[in-house]
A protein has these predicted regions:
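ABC-family P-loop ATPase nucleotide-binding domains
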Residues: 78-136
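Conserved ABC transporter NBD signature motif
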Residues: 56-67, 71-72
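Conserved structural motif at the start of ABC-family nucleotide-binding domains
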Residues: 1, 16-19
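The feature captures the beta-strand-to-loop junction immediately N-terminal to the Walker
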Residues: 33-35
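Short coil-to-beta microelement around the adenine-binding A-loop and adjacent beta1/P-loop entry
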Residues: 13-15, 70
């Protein structure tokens, strides 16, 4: 992933990021640190095509992420800090969402559930936030996306 000349304005007009350039290398682990409200989540959402930069570009495999092409989105998965899960079982969730990720591996997913000591719950919406995160991390890892 390449981020080129990225500008993200604050609501008050001062840029959060002004002309940032960054290359994310495959197989590497990165940390994103900063104060609350400084734009960490905004940057991640832009990297996933969920928000769009004011100026600059974010490319994955040479394609602008903001185009939201299926062949790009199937290679990216984000586990956000805050999220809701629908009132369905984890099996229904997997059935409905794994089709968007061609490298999804159900055996890996089941192993992650076992590692996290999670059951195939009947209603994801009624689980604790900690359990929801474990379910979503299990799904995310099993997608085998590069990012």
């Amino acid at each position: 992933m390449k981020i080129l000349n990225l500008v993200i304005p604050l609501k008050k007009g001062n840029p959060i990021f002004n002309g940032i350039n960054l290359t994310i290398q495959p197989g590497s682990v990165y940390g994103l640190l900063g104060k609350n409200g400084i734009g960490k989540s905004t940057l991640l959402y832009m990297m996933c095509g969920l928000m769009f930069p004011h100026k600059g570009s974010i490319r994955f495999d040479g394609i602008e992420v903001k185009r939201r092409l299926p062949e790009t989105l199937e290679k990216i998965f984000l586990v956000p800090e805050e999220f809701d899960l629908p009132s369905i079982s984890i099996d229904d969730y997997v059935r409905r969402n794994s089709v968007f990720y061609p490298n999804f591996n159900i055996d890996q997913f089941n192993q992650y559930l076992s590692d996290f000591e999670l059951e195939h719950t009947k209603n994801l919406a009624k689980t604790s936030m900690g359990q929801k995160k474990k379910y979503l991390v299990s799904f995310a890892l099993a997608t085998n996306t590069p990012l």
